[in-house]
Amino acid sequence: MKKTIKTLALFLLCLMCLILQASCSSDEEITDADANTELVKEATNYLNGEIVLRTNATMNGVNKTLLPEGCPTKFKFEWSKTDAQTFTISLLDFTVGNMGMIINFKCDVKTMVLNSWEQKEYTGDGWIKFKGEYGSVWGTDTDGSASSAKGSSVQGYYNAKTHEIQFIVNYNMMNVRSECFKQTIDKSRLATFDADKAKYEADLAAYKKEHGIK
């Protein structure tokens, strides 16, 4: 009897492992699938050109942006003319606070559907996922020396209905990342970008003075 119970328990354990493995494999296949074509079409009509977003820049895990509202950051989104599911994200001459480096970045990303775990976090209709690897980064250090790196990456989410967006750029250089926290795109920010950036720099200087940060 005990032997039968042990055999049954072992069988159930193996069955659970197989189900879990199949579920993970299926989820991975779903993640790699193209995003809904209608949502992608809607995305191309809005998520394109220069767009100003609020981001936090981190270096070695330390937030160099310092201010809770983040830094105005101008990204460019350009859709491929040959692959409807692909677009390029670029960022030119980016620096913030005391980061001590000017960064340029470009990466091709592919749109795809969300897996089951992501669907629980990004609820509602309209969400697509975008992911890219093997991007390029080049920049200038404070001493004027040039730097470059391969292998930068992007992963994020965009809602074609509400125009909410969230993504992280890993530059693969000096452990620097840009974190675009979830927000709704406001295209009017492009017209006020220079003024908003100047205000951010002034607020940052005041914050550093108040907290004794050099």
Where are these regions (language model features)?
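Bacterial Sec-dependent N-terminal signal peptides
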Residues: M1-T4, C17-I51, Y171-K214
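Tubular lipid-binding modules of the TULIP superfamily
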Residues: D34-G70, E78-T82
